[in-house]
């Protein structure tokens, strides 16, 4: 398992498939630009932690899982296993889990990997976070590339077991475009969960 986490009481994690824009989103949230980003999947292979010691708080960008060009399957599985173990180990300290997905591709990817013997990664991770009792926000990224926005978000809600229309789940589904700096729906959703856990003092980060 990853052993790089600073010893902080509270944490927010970003998780998702490779190449969905997690590191770009991390940069947008923190204003810090030292996070690796790249056009080929799998650039981030270990967690990036952004640490606010004075607030006893850390935001963690976990490595992407799923397809990574040129990366053997056993390595991909190992990374996914480490991500799962990290979340399990720190579940009690995680104030919110942000599952980042590619708004343009996510429904097609879910449908392509749905079958009697297969659960799509995004659906599995959403269920996993919920099962652990971690407040979950799905950051539906790259929405600037989506034309049929409401229809696409309704379809995603349905795939995640949420009854459309998607708007009734605005504390769980946040349409954003990290590259364009348009992340206010995510900030509002995260603030909702921070408020529920009496951590309004962390609003300044979102």
From Swiss-Prot:
GO terms for biological process: cell division. Mg(2+) binds at residues 23, 44. InterPro entries: G_ENGB_dom, GTP-bd, GTP-bd_ribosome_bio_YsxC, P-loop_NTPase, Small_GTP-bd. Pfam families: MMR_HSR1. Residues 8-196 form the EngB-type G domain. GTP binds at residues 16-23, 42-46, 61-64, 141-144, 176-178. One of its GO terms (molecular function) is GTP binding. Its cofactor is Mg(2+). Keywords: Cell cycle, Cell division, GTP-binding, Magnesium, Metal-binding, Nucleotide-binding, Septation. Necessary for normal cell division and for the maintenance of normal septation. Belongs to the TRAFAC class TrmE-Era-EngA-EngB-Septin-like GTPase superfamily. EngB GTPase family. This is Probable GTP-binding protein EngB.
């Amino acid at each position: 398992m990853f052993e790089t986490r600073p010893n902080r009481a509270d944490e927010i994690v970003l998780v998702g498939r490779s190449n969905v824009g997690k590191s770009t989103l991390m940069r947008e949230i923190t204003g810090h630009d030292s996070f690796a980003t790249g056009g080929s999947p799998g650039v981030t292979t270990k967690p990036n932690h952004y640490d606010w010691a004075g607030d006893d708080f850390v935001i963690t960008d976990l490595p992407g899982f799923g397809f990574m060009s040129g990366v053997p399957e056993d390595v991909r599985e190992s990374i996914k296993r480490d991500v799962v173990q990290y979340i399990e180990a720190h579940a009690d300290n995680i104030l919110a889990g942000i599952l980042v997905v590619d708004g343009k591709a996510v429904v097609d990817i879910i449908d392509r990997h749905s079958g009697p013997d297969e659960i799509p990664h995004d659906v599995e991770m959403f269920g996993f976070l919920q099962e652990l009792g971690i407040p979950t926000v799905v950051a539906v990224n790259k929405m600037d590339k989506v034309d049929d926005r409401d229809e696409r978000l309704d379809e995603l809600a349905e795939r995640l077991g949420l009854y459309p229309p998607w708007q009734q789940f605005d504390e769980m589904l946040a349409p954003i475009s990290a590259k364009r700096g348009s992340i206010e729906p995510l900030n509002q959703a995260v603030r909702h969960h921070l408020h529920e856990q009496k951590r309004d003092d962390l609003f300044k980060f979102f």
